[in-house]
């Protein structure tokens, strides 16, 4: 019985160890989904209008948010890395902005915490495709 419990514990923790070690080596979000024309246009609009996404490379919700855009559109976004050990980290800016969690969007000076659908972002920013 004890052997089965140990085996179960190892199996349950192994995926998280593998995932976190992969992320820690990269120290940046790796977006794999493909963008649509609409998501690229929205990302460009957000960037042109000063919308900022505060993020951390190790944050699963940040990755989920980025995957909604796809890799091509993600490159267009204004993203601030808040993790101290992240690539191009801007931790002090995140502290100054009082970022409490990730992802956080800054839209027209207002901070909005959480994953937002592309439709929600469009509505909040006045983007009309």
Q: What are the functions of these language-model segments?
A:
Residues 35-76:
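Local sequence-structure signature of Cys/Sec-based thiol-disulfide redox active-site neighborhoods
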Residues 106-129:
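Non-catalytic, surface beta->alpha helical segment in thiol-disulfide oxidoreductase systems
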Residues 57-62, 83-85, 100-101, 111-113:
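Solvent-exposed loop/turn segments at secondary-structure junctions
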Residues 1-28:
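N-terminal targeting signals for export/organelle localization
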Residues 52-55, 78-80, 104-106, 111:
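Structural recognition of the beta-strand scaffold that forms the well-ordered cores
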Residues 95-107:
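Structural micro-motif
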